């Protein structure tokens, strides 16, 4: 069996790792970096991923997609999506099924389809390192992701050509990376994970019994729409407002300026983690009738902290809930681990330290720990890692809607997965022949305030007074945290089963279509690359031939020169087209036309060689004089 790689599919950056022998190793990408920006750009005839996509964002803001993880598995009408629509430079659109999709280059795409481009880059990075095809992966998700978001992440893996062996929670993966090589004793750790777009807290117990380590998640909580992107947006809004005060121009209407501002804001935020003050200096940010305008604004660390204080505070509430759910106090926590790039901010570290009453560990790389943990889990599933048992939990309660619009829970939040639960329900009316099973996820008593995961009908129930039929509903939650539901009429034995797919989400047919499109794009990308290579060869050939014509001078007969010029012009024309075979043919034609020129160039080279030989021979004829010292007294 091939390697199972571990992928941290992040909002801002992604990372891939693999077990190298018995040690997990983070793999550098083609640009030599250990993390890859989760940025995808669509240009004319090409899809760019990572740093190349990020570099051209300023000139192509509408077709450069970032922070797509904030949309994955979400409905267009979601409050969070509506907030993002106002601040994203690219178009977020409503799909036919009500999901939030994006539009680039006039094409509508599902979030999993776009995320698949990042996963493909991770897959290729691993394949280049391993020297063999990779088909299986463990992909991480925020612990607080719901069923639809987990399913959408699995879909992205499938579209990228990966069999997703396991979906694992990010804090759990970080705990695996941290706890695997720690010796001795049981410990209870808190993993505070503040990434680019999501926030999680997990309380995890690591037990060691006779050499076997058990990682048991006691509780988890979080906010799937809180992260570094929100911190960036606070900085962007501040800079825009300051510029408007100073110059009277609102940059929000200028996508190009906003893209430059986004980069500058992120850079300033990062600099303020180590410096007390930084300058945001953007010349020619915009222009009006009076001429070009420049931005030069000083930002202090204190100002940034004031801008984001409520965001940091917002992350502390889930900590209290997670501790209460685990039935623990802060004194029971042995180690605090920080994960996610945003935890490099001193204010975040200070607030977390104050909350837990202890300094967070500094021996965990916040950008790489999650991918490393995913690679370890890949090793566990492949049988390469023994003596490790991982017990994860479901972040939210699962149940069905019952009479009066009430949610009746079948599986409580923080239940260890995989798990199974069943409950017998009945009909609400006399002679009811069908029941609708409406599956929900969330903590509210009122069904309407919880996330609807989908619904299905169980039909063919025998007529009977209400309350008589016995309908058994079974919830089966797998190790990926994805739910399978069945309902059975105990009298007739009729059964209906579904794997939960929300009213949104991608159907198998849509995923298959996207897989095929990805394959077709692979072929198109290959053709594009071959065409680019052919054009480069044509350019080199034209340049070399023109250079030789100049060097040959009068030695090249006029008719030969005319023949070559015609061949060059034909190659120039072919080079502008899309036909590689035509370019190759015209390259051959130019080589044939330049035959005489090649001969002249060769003769000239030989003549030069001969001249050089003669001059060195002349130098060889010079005899070194022999000096003899003569004493004066011998004169």
Curated annotation (Swiss-Prot):
Alphabetical list of NCBIfam families matching this protein: PRK00290.1, PRK05183.1, prok_dnaK
Species of the source: Vibrio cholerae serotype O1 (strain ATCC 39315 / El Tor Inaba N16961)
One example GO MF annotation: ATP hydrolysis activity
Known role: Acts as a chaperone.
Residue positions, PTM Phosphothreonine: 198
Amino acid composition bias (Acidic residues), ranges on this chain: 621-635
Listed PROSITE patterns: HSP70_1, HSP70_2, HSP70_3
Record's keyword terms, sorted: ATP-binding, Chaperone, Nucleotide-binding, Phosphoprotein, Stress response
Regulation: induction: By stress conditions e.g. heat shock.
InterPro entries: ATPase_NBD, Chaperone_DnaK, Heat_shock_70_CS, HSP70_C_sf, HSP70_peptide-bd_sf, Hsp_70_fam
Biased composition (Low complexity): 601-616
Signal peptide (residue range): none
Region (Disordered): 601-635
Gene3D superfamilies assigned to the protein according to its UniProt record, in alphabetical order: 1.20.1270.10, 3.30.420.40, Actin, Chain A, domain 4 (3.90.640.10), Substrate Binding Domain Of DNAk, Chain A, domain 1 (2.60.34.10)
GO CC annotation terms, alphabetical: cytosol
Family the UniProt entry places it in: Belongs to the heat shock protein 70 family.
Pfam families assigned to the protein according to its UniProt record, in alphabetical order: HSP70 (PF00012)
One example of a Gene Ontology biological process annotation: protein refolding
Protein name: Chaperone protein DnaK
